[in-house]
Amino acid sequence: NIDTLGASLDPDALGAHLVSGNILTFEVVPRRIYDRGGGLARVNGRVRLLEGLAQPREEDELNLRYYNSQTTWIQIDPLLQLFGLTRADLSASDTKVAEAVRRMGRRMPTYVTIKDAKRRWGHGQEDVYPVAQFEKLWSDMTALADVSCGFLVVPRLRGQQLKDLNQLDPWANDGSKEYTARLCGLAR
């Protein structure tokens, strides 16, 4: 995710993923009150990521303790096998890959959200149009019984998402800004 700051190739996280034997390992961070988008939940006895769109009431996500950072560690060959593909298929047949993706997509829910699309024109003028957006969410892979998934709680520094300007001050003051600057080689 472009708005997840602090994600990096961490040898400890990679090692934990490899030792787990899971196809997918999702990093989660402790949730803060302003985090939106879903988190770790138990649904019908299975631990999974439950996005805000999938929850019956908007306020339900406030009860989740861990937030989805959108960072996922993946075992490529088992994931391809789940899709009915091999590495060779990726460069050999666009049609086969597209069919495999569509087949997997049919197993997952589709969410419809209403968003505002803005068309700016003139000096300070804009038109706002409501549009329907159809979404499939990567985190819904955690709901599929044949996909072995794990979850790794990581420091907030590794998985904090900035979706709103109001989140900049807490990000700058909790050490996340310095952590990200070090990752990017910008630390003073």
Region spans (language model):
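Catalytic core of tubulin tyrosine ligase-like
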Residues: 6-10, 15-188
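Short beta-strand-to-loop acidic/aromatic patch adjacent to the donor-nucleotide binding site
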Residues: 1-4
